[in-house]
Amino acid sequence: MPADIMEKNSSSPVAATPASVNTTPDKPKTASEHRKSSKPIMEKRRRARINESLSQLKTLILDALKKDSSRHSKLEKADILEMTVKHLRNLQRAQMTAALSTDPSVLGKYRAGFSECMNEVTRFLSTCEGVNTEVRTRLLGHLANCMTQINAMTYPGQAHPALQAPPPPPPSGPGGPQHAPFAPPPPLVPIPGGAAPPPGSAPCKLGSQAGEAAKVFGGFQVVPAPDGQFAFLIPNGAFAHSGPVIPVYTSNSGTSVGPNAVSPSSGSSLTADSMWRPWRN
């Protein structure tokens, strides 16, 4: 009998041990299950927020574009986002145009800032030894292309017609030569024609690259046109008449001066020998 009692007493703690082992991991399982059960609810709420925002965005963009909402009741989410991006870009362009209309120096400041940043990047890449050569070349080429596009930007034609590269000059009508009086400092550009040049002329310094930045010489700005030609931008106060621009076009045969600067007499035209060629200086 005592032996049986001892066996029962010795077996009871062993039998109780599995029960205690099974009860301890219940708390982590409960927390994990709680997170798993709450995840679909969180996802459902997130999708509901996205759909609500897209619905409001759809209403706003259709009102802004003045489109009938009944005809666009089944727009996809991607269509709503694309329409919004296009609308914001148009607003950005309109703001830039308005800024240029009120302050003509905005574009010049933007170009100067971009050029300064590009120079800083170039200096860093030239001194940094850990940059891959291919990456450096691609980055500098990309910045050069961006700089060319920025230099091709012009001011709005309605607000500042004098700041655009003018078209080729049309054939002038009959009449004597007309000269625009203006007096910036030398160097001088001789104006061809029968009469003597005016007291002062626009300083000229033509770049060899079409994408070269516009430069200012003696108060006059030289702007490269996309077709490889150049135009002088003359301030309005430097003219005695209404013509605000004296365009200078470069070509293989020579340089022609716009009609506001020289108007040949009837029955005569400027020959190639009478044209000023900058490469002969």
From Swiss-Prot:
Where are the compositionally biased (Pro residues) regions?
164-174, 182-201
Which SMART domains does the record match to this protein? Answer: HLH, ORANGE
Give any Gene Ontology cellular component: cytoplasm
Free-text tissue specificity from the UniProt record: Present in all tissues examined but highest in epithelial cells and in mesoderm-derived tissues such as embryonal muscle cells.
Region (Disordered) residue spans: 1-44, 158-206, 255-281
Q: Where in the cell is it found?
A: Nucleus
Q: Where is this motif: WRPW motif?
A: 276-279
Gene Ontology biological process terms from the UniProt entry: adenohypophysis development; amacrine cell differentiation; aorta morphogenesis; artery morphogenesis; ascending aorta morphogenesis; BMP signaling pathway; Cajal-Retzius cell differentiation; cardiac neural crest cell development involved in outflow tract morphogenesis
PROSITE patterns assigned to the protein according to its UniProt record, in alphabetical order: BHLH, ORANGE
Point out the signal peptide segment.
Answer: none
Regions of biased composition (Low complexity) lie at 10-21
Composition skew (Polar residues), residue ranges: 255-272
* An annotated Gene Ontology molecular function: DNA binding
Q: Which SUPFAM superfamilies match?
A: HLH, helix-loop-helix DNA-binding domain, Orange domain-like
**Residue span(s) of domain Orange:** 110-143
List the keywords (alphabetical): DNA-binding, Nucleus, Repressor, Transcription, Transcription regulation
Specify the bHLH domain's residue ranges.
34-91
Q: Where is the composition biased (Basic and acidic residues)?
A: 26-35
Its domain description in UniProt is: Has a particular type of basic domain (presence of a helix-interrupting proline) that binds to the N-box (CACNAG), rather than the canonical E-box (CANNTG). The C-terminal WRPW motif is a transcriptional repression domain necessary for the interaction with Groucho/TLE family members, transcriptional corepressors recruited to specific target DNA by Hairy-related proteins.
User: What is known about its subunit structure?
Assistant: Interacts with SIRT1. Interacts weakly with TLE2. Interacts with HES6. Transcription repression requires formation of a complex with a corepressor protein of the Groucho/TLE family. Interacts (via WPRW motif) with TLE1. Interacts with an FA complex, composed of FANCA, FANCF, FANCG and FANCL, but not of FANCC, nor FANCE.
Q: Which PANTHER family match?
A: BASIC HELIX-LOOP-HELIX TRANSCRIPTION FACTOR, HES-RELATED (PTHR10985)
Known function: Transcriptional repressor of genes that require a bHLH protein for their transcription. May act as a negative regulator of myogenesis by inhibiting the functions of MYOD1 and ASH1. Binds DNA on N-box motifs: 5'-CACNAG-3' with high affinity and on E-box motifs: 5'-CANNTG-3' with low affinity. May play a role in a functional FA core complex response to DNA cross-link damage, being required for the stability and nuclear localization of FA core complex proteins, as well as for FANCD2 monoubiquitination in response to DNA damage.
**Name of this protein:** Transcription factor HES-1
